[in-house]
Amino acid sequence: MANAEHLALLRAGASGWNAWRAWRDTTPDLSRASLRGVDLSGFDLSRTDLRGADLRGANLSGTNLSAAHLEGANLFKAVLDGADLAGAYLYGAQFLNCAQLVVTRNWQSAFRDEALACGASIPK
């Protein structure tokens, strides 16, 4: 379950969230959070626990999702253009497809299911 403090910081906006992330060495917990349709563009969500989060229709353009845990997250119609997926965990991500994946950065290094090979090898 998402940490209420982390969720409140996220809802306050990218500048406050990113400043908090710059000063805190923590793993934000947004697991199973309802973030449907939320504009998360430009957020630093690196190393964030987003397992099972509802990200349907969320704008994740330019978001840093490196090493984020997105296992089981619902990404139906999520916008991922330019998001950084270096080392992200995408196993079991729902409604994610190659068309969404290939417009991101560093997607080839993301840990993902065979269905999301998208012509590139999958890291072990």
Task: Kindly give the residue locations of the regions a language model identified.
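Tandem repeat scaffolds
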Residues: 4-8, 12-124
